[in-house]
Amino acid sequence: MKISKMQVHNIRSILDCTINMADYSVLIGQNNVGKSNILAALRLFYDKIKFNDAEDFPKIQTTDNESWVEITFSTTESEQALLKEEYKTADGFLKLRRIFKTDNKDFPIKASNSNIFAYEHGVLSNRNFYGAKNVSLGKIGDLIYIPAVNKIEDI
């Protein structure tokens, strides 16, 4: 699976952002424009860091009380074959949303769940993707994050 698109909603300084990805993607920009927050959103999706409402929800006015990251994966035929029927698509994409905060009672957010929800037949399902937290995270691969090194001693 490859990430083809990432959408971020109400994470740190990002209210709404869509990034189309390629095989290799680069984030370029001036200081303090949100590059690190894009990476933080990706790390939040993969459960590498935990969502903290006080730190991760925007400090500025938002249009709603939701916080989520949505990733669209392009899959191969063999990867599609391994998916449950409800997650398979004709175009070979798998679209998942990890919800960190919401007032919508249709999406039960629990610490014991992955809180990753899949699109089924083009509609966001309110059932957790593959149910158990460890199973759902195992289905989407892993993220390797290499932090910046400021001192030679840190290498």
Sequence positions of predicted segments:
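Pre-Walker A-like glycine/lysine-rich segment at the N-terminus of P-loop NTPase domains
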Residues: 1-47, 57-59
